[in-house]
Amino acid sequence: MAKELKGPGFHFDVHTDLRADQKAEVLIEALPWLEEFAGQRIVIKYGGNAMIDDHLKACFAEDMVFLRQVGLHPVVVHGGGPQISQMLKALGIKSEFKGGLRVTTPEAMDVVRMVLTGKVSRELVGLINAHGPFAVGLSGEDGALFSAMQRKPVIDGKPTDIGLVGDVVSVDASAVEDLINAGRIPVVSSVAPNEDDATEVLNVNADSAAAALAAALGASKLVVLTDVDGLYADWPDRDSLIGRIGVENLRDMLPDLESGMRPKMEACVRAIDGGVPRAHIIDGRKPHSILNEIFTTDGIGTMVVPEDGIEMRSSYGN
């Protein structure tokens, strides 16, 4: 866990520069949230810079172990866009995009499957298991966890074939339930069999897959890691960061969101529609952002809830 903060002319060590009473205050602030979420399931979508930077990867693994050890049940769902692009380039396979979406040919799908299940998943499982035998990797193919339907998005006004890309349409969470009941931390790769042809595997959006799994598990929260502070009402005005937004308010905003943020916010909507009480978008570039969200009173990032209304984060001083 990070022990020091450094910058030009600045150095802070949490061991030596916090008084004993200040350390106690931090722990006491977490108490009501430890009580509220004890025994609860929380689905975390792992992505962005948090899965590229070595320090952030280690911090994320520590967060998952912390959650498990204080009585929560974390479930991780991950993609791996940067790693897939890197491997395709190394193999001399051209990456093609249409409307910002990767075209996944059968050749590219083999690479997607290999990278997600054989590289990204194994690395994260290893980082978590450095702290004890907690994590188990599986994909959306295992135990028929996910079933997906091939997607033809509308690009420039017409349905467009982008290859072996799909959306999760059903979830059988029994394999994940078994792991949770055994005290494990499931780490799920976002590939899934095609509902129309079980021999064919589709590359599915990890945000959407995490939302579907959160709903199927009856999770208390969906937390999506991003490379921004949260959802802004008027980007690039940084004072317009939203702290809390109702799902219907968010639904109205979706058509105007940038392409990178839209699938993440759509995942939050899907989770709330599926009965998940809270969905969060937080900045995964900040070490231990998961713990800051769950165990502090104000939290961080943007929280989506069933109730109407919008609150700016500036209104409660964080």
Swiss-Prot record:
GO terms, molecular function: acetylglutamate kinase activity; ATP binding
Name under which the protein is recorded: Acetylglutamate kinase
Top-level EC class: transferase
Domain of life the protein comes from: Bacteria
Site residues, Transition state stabilizer: 45, 264
Enzyme Commission number(s) of this protein: 2.7.2.8
Reaction(s) catalysed (UniProt annotation): N-acetyl-L-glutamate + ATP = N-acetyl-L-glutamyl 5-phosphate + ADP
Pathway field: Amino-acid biosynthesis; L-arginine biosynthesis; N(2)-acetyl-L-ornithine from L-glutamate: step 2/4
UniProt entry tagged with the keyword Hydrolase: no
Compartment annotation: Cytoplasm
GO cellular component: cytoplasm
GO biological process: arginine biosynthetic process via ornithine; L-arginine biosynthetic process
InterPro entries (UniProt xref): AceGlu_kinase-like_sf, AcgluKinase_fam, ArgB, Asp/Glu/Uridylate_kinase, Glu/AcGlu_kinase, NAGK-C
Ligand binding (substrate): 80-81, 102, 203
Keywords, comma-separated and alphabetical: Amino-acid biosynthesis, Arginine biosynthesis, ATP-binding, Cytoplasm, Kinase, Nucleotide-binding, Transferase
Function summary: Catalyzes the ATP-dependent phosphorylation of N-acetyl-L-glutamate.
Similarity comment text for this entry: Belongs to the acetylglutamate kinase family. ArgB subfamily.
